[in-house]
């Protein structure tokens, strides 16, 4: 990561009134302009200058208002499994960030077969497709087009929009806003001085707020008034061992319990929004992390990166590597030079699951 990028990220995560020198001043100026643009954009949608399309099925939007990870993908998976368990015909629509099919759009999965590679679908949609048998997953920047595809090809009754809180071009029946429990709005500044994708007052568009990683404690930022607030945690579920295979079906995965890797000496690496949280989580599970490597969020691993990872493991004298599920997807086909390769599997757990389910049924008018 370049020194400039590191400096910008430091400013974005600094205190709201902290003096960050010339870089901070420049980013503050840019963020003021960006905030004005986002307010104008919202007004243009309100006045009808920008059109909001209607889907032919019920739409549940899952998203955040900040840059970085708040658990959108685990939440989309949680909802898809829940609706599927209720006997509802559900599908997921994702933008397909980083995938070659983002502009064209298409089905990553029809609920039976995986139809696209990770490079085509994007890492997160492909991961959802693998983890959700029976649930179609489509990708594409045009969410209305994706909704029509799901309704016509799969008979979808409920469509989950992944990462769509700020995507105003499609109407939705339920708008779920995910916020980090410790810092719901970052430092309160919009991008690039802070982490906000749009001004914090726009959080009021949410029908409900979900505090993720609630086990880390709650921050002091005021959440939208009059909105139900639910809390959930990211719980380690187990470890996935990776064996490379070619084709859209991706790698062969073998599941292990959390106890299977206790005391195992590994080198860890990650390219997500909260790498340190991932490393700390491994240590808390009893994994002996002897060395670690951090990469930017959504990092595309080059041959050089992979060689550095292997060299790190060799220097640490370990026989295994461990990473996140999202990073594992980006390494499809990699044999890790004979090293064992694992990923930590994460699942959401609500503090008051029944209360949240009752809320969903009420808002979406789903019968028992």
Swiss-Prot record:
GO BP term, pick one: lipid A biosynthetic process
Pathway noted in the entry: Glycolipid biosynthesis; lipid IV(A) biosynthesis; lipid IV(A) from (3R)-3-hydroxytetradecanoyl-[acyl-carrier-protein] and UDP-N-acetyl-alpha-D-glucosamine: step 6/6
Listed GO MF terms: ATP binding; tetraacyldisaccharide 4'-kinase activity
InterPro entries on file: LpxK, P-loop_NTPase
UniProt EC number: 2.7.1.130
UniProt binding sites for ATP: 66-73
GO cellular component terms given for this protein: plasma membrane
Top-level division of the source organism's lineage: Bacteria
SUPFAM superfamilies (UniProt xref): P-loop containing nucleoside triphosphate hydrolases
Keywords: ATP-binding, Kinase, Lipid A biosynthesis, Lipid biosynthesis, Lipid metabolism, Nucleotide-binding, Transferase
Catalytic activity: a lipid A disaccharide + ATP = a lipid IVA + ADP + H(+)
Summary of the function given for this chain in its UniProt record: Transfers the gamma-phosphate of ATP to the 4'-position of a tetraacyldisaccharide 1-phosphate intermediate (termed DS-1-P) to form tetraacyldisaccharide 1,4'-bis-phosphate (lipid IVA).
Family annotation (HAMAP family): LpxK
Homology family: Belongs to the LpxK family.
PANTHER family in UniProt: TETRAACYLDISACCHARIDE 4'-KINASE, TETRAACYLDISACCHARIDE 4'-KINASE, MITOCHONDRIAL-RELATED
Name assigned to this protein: Tetraacyldisaccharide 4'-kinase
């Amino acid at each position: 990561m370049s020194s400039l990028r590191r400096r910008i990220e430091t400013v974005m995560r600094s205190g709201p009134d902290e003096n960050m020198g010339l870089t901070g001043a420049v980013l503050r100026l840019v963020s003021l302009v960006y905030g004005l643009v986002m307010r104008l954009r919202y007004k243009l949608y309100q006045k009808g200058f920008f059109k909001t399309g209607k889907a032919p099925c019920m739409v549940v939007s899952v998203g955040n208002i900040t840059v970085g990870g708040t658990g959108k993908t685990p939440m989309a998976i949680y909802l898809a499994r829940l609706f599927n368990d209720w006997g509802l015909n559900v599908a997921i629509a994702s933008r397909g960030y980083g995938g070659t099919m983002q502009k064209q759009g298409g089905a990553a999965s029809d609920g039976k077969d995986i139809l696209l590679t990770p490079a085509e679908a994007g890492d997160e949609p492909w991961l959802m497709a693998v983890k959700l048998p029976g649930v179609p997953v489509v990708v594409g920047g045009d969410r209305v087009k994706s909704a029509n595809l799901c309704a016509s090809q799969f008979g979808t009754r409920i469509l989950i929009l992944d990462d769509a809180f700020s995507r105003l071009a499609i109407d939705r029946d339920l708008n779920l806003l995910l916020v980090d429990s410790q810092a719901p709005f970052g430092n309160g500044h919009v991008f690039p001085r802070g982490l906000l994708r749009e001004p914090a007052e726009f959080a009021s568009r949410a029908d409900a707020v979900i505090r993720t990683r609630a086990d880390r404690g709650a921050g002091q930022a005021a959440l939208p008034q009059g909105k139900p607030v639910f809390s959930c945690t990211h719980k380690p579920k187990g470890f996935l061992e990776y064996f490379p295979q070619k084709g859209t079906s991706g790698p062969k995965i073998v599941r292990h319990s959390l106890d299977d890797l206790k005391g195992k000496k590994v080198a860890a690496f990650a390219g997500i929004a909260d790498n340190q949280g991932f490393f700390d989580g491994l240590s808390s599970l009893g994994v002996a992390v002897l060395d670690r490597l951090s990469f930017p969020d959504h990092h595309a691993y080059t041959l050089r990166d992979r060689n550095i990872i292997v060299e790190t493991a060799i220097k640490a004298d370990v026989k295994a590597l461990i990473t996140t599920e999202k990073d594992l997807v980006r390494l499809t086909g990699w044999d890790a030079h004979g090293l064992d390769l694992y990923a930590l599997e994460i699942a959401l757990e609500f503090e008051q699951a029944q209360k949240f389910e009752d809320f969903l049924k009420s808002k979406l008018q789903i019968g028992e």
